[in-house]
Amino acid sequence: MNRPLLSVAGSLFVAAWALYIFSCFQHGHVPPRRIPPHDTFGALPTAALPSNARDTAAHPSDTADNTSGSSTTTDPRSHGNAPPAPVGGAAQTHTQPPVQTAMRIALWNRATHGEQGALQHLLAGLWIQTEISPNSGDIHPLLFFDREHAEITFSRASVQEIFLVDSAHTHRKTVSFLTRNTAISSIRRRLEVTFESHEVIHVRAVEDVARLKIGSTSMWDGQYTRYHAGPASAPSP
């Protein structure tokens, strides 16, 4: 085959290929092209978002501001954790009571309705004397009621006495304890705790040494309030 014939054949092939490409574009049949998937560009996986954020990601036009006439799309990553819109143009703040306070109020309500044991549960924790008795000096005594170990700890300055609860009896708003010293078992102490509220109690202690009751005013007698951590909890001497 001579060279002029090869040249004619090549020209015919090029013309046929050009005609094919022109025909494809004319009829809309564009040859396929590899397009990388959308996820490879860092698209946010909507399955990991809250439901309201998934709705925003699926329909971003729903978040357009139609009142002002502008179209603004909310970022779904911030929409899921955004606080609720304020009512009436002002931020609404609601102070929720601490969980422990709510539980104590519930216990107090149950106790006032006569539920046995509610007052003893309500006593658990640390209490500080607010009305200093004449025998306690300038130091505010502390009482710690430990229900888990059935112990009552009496503290004042460097003095700390731990008494084990032998028995407890509740009558109306008063809990009576019979206790004994963990170090010297012959030292017993009767304790009467009367509730004025779920945060205020009145305590009367009677010493019982070797079965001899000492009826004088005890340094532990007086009014106590529940101790809350913080500089404002402890009253000034």
From Swiss-Prot:
It comes from Treponema pallidum (strain Nichols). Residues 63-75 have a biased composition (Polar residues). Residues 1-28 form the signal peptide. Pfam families: Pallilysin. Residues 52-96 are annotated as: Disordered. Keywords: Signal. This is Uncharacterized protein TP_0751.
